[in-house]
Amino acid sequence: VLGLSHVEKMIAGHGYWTNTPLDYMRAMRENLRDTLQKFSVKFWMTEQCVMSNDEEIGGGGGYDTTMKTALYVARWIHHDLVYANAASWQWWRAIGEDYKDGLLEDFGQETIENGKLSDSRLLWCLGNYSRYIKPNAKRIAIKLSVAESPTGLMASAFRNPDGSIVSVVINYSDREEILKFPHKVNGIYLTNDAAGCKLQSCATNGKCVSVPPKSVVTVVMD
């Protein structure tokens, strides 16, 4: 079907059961990327969610508003965008109850008139990407002064159609990292446990950015 003019040269996939162990998570995505590049086919990650094999965060059972699940999912997003070269990324479910599959927690009222919902850091970590990386953005190279690690620092960068550059940095570690960017920083947006369930705007300091422990930070540049 690749030769049909009305069929997009793209393959869509679901990422379930591909996140552990960590070396496998990266290797299988690189293999997917290399295979699709041979045929000039794009990849979309069209569904992802916490499952029972995600033992690092206790599997899927029980809702979690904290950075534990949010960082875990941010690491997935990073690997899908950087190593699988995904051109699009979608989460499975907007609202959930006693499971880690909802961006919002539903407290289970039986009527639709007066129910209660609560947001999570998972929602806002998704926002670190989706609010600032615009449609048709192109991923560009970024070089860290320290080795990238799935249990430490991970970073990706994108150029939006308007020319602005967005970098999303994940700090999985327990120590602060200070990064210096080559462009003037116009905005810094933080998600961590201390910031609460929101994207917290931070003061800019020239080209230097503080990335707190256990956080996701979006840096917007000229």
Where are these regions (language model features)?
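C-terminal beta-strand-rich structural cap/linker in extracellular carbohydrate-active enzymes
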Residues: 202-222
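Carbohydrate-binding surface patches
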Residues: 146-184, 214
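Loop/turn elements at helix/coil->beta-strand transitions in domains of secreted/extracellular proteins
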Residues: 6-9, 38-42, 84-89, 135, ...
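Alpha-helical scaffolding within the catalytic cores
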Residues: 1-2, 25-34, 71-79, 150-153
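Solvent-exposed beta-hairpin/edge-strand motifs
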Residues: 183-197
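Active-site neighborhood of glycoside hydrolase catalytic domains
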Residues: 1-52
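Flexible loop/turn segments at secondary-structure boundaries
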Residues: 17-22, 50-55, 96-101, 174-177, ...
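Aromatic/acidic polysaccharide-binding cleft in carbohydrate-active enzymes
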Residues: 42-131, 140-146
